[in-house]
Amino acid sequence: MRLALRIAYDGTAFYGFQRQPGLRTVEGEIIRALTKLGIIEDVESSNFKGASRTDRGVSAFFNVVAFDVASRPDLVRPEVLNFHLKDVWVLGTAEVPEDFHPRFWAKSKTYRYYLIDAGFDEKAMRECAKLFIGTHDFSAFARLEPHKNPVRELIRADIIKRQGYYIIELEGKSFLWEMARRIVNALRFCGLGILTEEEVEKMLNGEYSRKIPPARPEGLVLWGIEYEGIEFRGNEKGIRKAKHDLFERYSEALTRAALFGDLLLGL
């Protein structure tokens, strides 16, 4: 039997998703819990796979892992797993085909970036965002790896205005390393008048050697992954711990924001 988990996590608590010797990672935390419960024996025999290897500091509301169950499939429930996990929350489970790979079966991925309003020219940001939609060579907007094709398709680039901040939502079939964060910084630079639409077009066409640095990872969330025929099921009991933990983090963040806001006003 092969099962998949829909997971959320606080990326600031980990050194990224992928296992690294001596470091706390999302993948390592999940594998620790699964082996402790006897659900899997080890990574190799369980064919453990993840959908997205998010960087250090990047959070997720919808990432996916899959594995072959060695025993105790009855324990693969959000309420059981969440009791044994820290800073990771299982929001749903699904039985999947034996050849299911969460990365290769994904139809699209959606990232959200939360950006404090620094007096941006919203119109300039929106015009700049339109340039990224479609199929392009994103070499100027990614940390390139030798074996990766830099051509990718961005399905949409939405800018959502909220009170005091923006949400930049990017959906694509796949993303290069740091691609989402570098696109965000390009939009930020356009909004600040540091970068023009013409320069962005030249970079996408390979006519301009300038590279855009990545935005900070803490503002990025893997928001969604689309699959065909895979339905993740959860329940209120299963997500109770997630709600409690996220509210604690939300309360702490609001307290610190209020504190530093008053310090800033007092200067």
Swiss-Prot record:
<comment type="function">
    <text>Formation of pseudouridine at positions 38, 39 and 40 in the anticodon stem and loop of transfer RNAs.</text>
</comment>
<dbReference type="Pfam" id="PF01416">
    <property type="entry name" value="PseudoU_synth_1"/>
</dbReference>
<feature type="binding site">
    <location>
        <position position="111"/>
    </location>
    <ligand>
        <name>substrate</name>
    </ligand>
</feature>
<dbReference type="InterPro" id="IPR001406">
    <property type="entry name" value="PsdUridine_synth_TruA"/>
</dbReference>
<feature type="active site" description="Nucleophile">
    <location>
        <position position="55"/>
    </location>
</feature>
<dbReference type="GO" id="GO:0031119">
    <property type="term" value="P:tRNA pseudouridine synthesis"/>
</dbReference>
<dbReference type="InterPro" id="IPR020095">
    <property type="entry name" value="PsdUridine_synth_TruA_C"/>
</dbReference>
<dbReference type="GO" id="GO:0003723">
    <property type="term" value="F:RNA binding"/>
</dbReference>
<dbReference type="InterPro" id="IPR020097">
    <property type="entry name" value="PsdUridine_synth_TruA_a/b_dom"/>
</dbReference>
<dbReference type="InterPro" id="IPR020103">
    <property type="entry name" value="PsdUridine_synth_cat_dom_sf"/>
</dbReference>
<protein>
    <recommendedName>
        <fullName>tRNA pseudouridine synthase A</fullName>
        <ecNumber>5.4.99.12</ecNumber>
    </recommendedName>
</protein>
<keyword id="KW-0819">tRNA processing</keyword>
<dbReference type="InterPro" id="IPR020094">
    <property type="entry name" value="TruA/RsuA/RluB/E/F_N"/>
</dbReference>
<dbReference type="GO" id="GO:0160147">
    <property type="term" value="F:tRNA pseudouridine(38-40) synthase activity"/>
</dbReference>
<comment type="similarity">
    <text>Belongs to the tRNA pseudouridine synthase TruA family.</text>
</comment>
<keyword id="KW-0413">Isomerase</keyword>
